[in-house]
Amino acid sequence: AVTVTTMLVRIPIPASQGYLNFGDIMIMLVAVLFGPLVGGFAGGVGSALADVIGYPSWALFTLVIKGTEGVIVGWFSKGTTNYGRILLGTVLGGIVMVLGYVSVAYVLYGPGGAVAEFYNDIVQAVSGIIIGGGLGYILKKRIGPILE
């Protein structure tokens, strides 16, 4: 699901040789519902597969960055329907994702690549927090006992 969501909308970012996508929505949704192991696997492997198909130079970085994002979101969300805790997890996961990609873009492509990456990653993080985290919270309140 993460791979498909990531590939559905891909807007290239020439300065960083990456792309804007909405895979973070699915990463955060899965991590909220299923916890850190599934969230980390879905985030890392699902997103890296999308990169292998379209942007292979980013695949290894994506495996680590998006995997960490999923683990963080899942860890904060595991065993709770507390909105504040889920929100904190999605925000921290989003921050880690943005900082991870901006750092890699800076090393590989310099300040211009990092700036281009920053703005696009902010859009991805915010969409993931609002849509993925919000939907995850709503679903978990309704069907949480089935998933845990």
Curated annotation (Swiss-Prot):
Entry GO CC: membrane
Gene3D superfamilies, per the entry: 1.10.1760.20
PANTHER family: UPF0397 PROTEIN BC_2624-RELATED (PTHR37815), UPF0397 PROTEIN SPR0429 (PTHR37815:SF3)
Protein name: Uncharacterized protein in gap 3'region
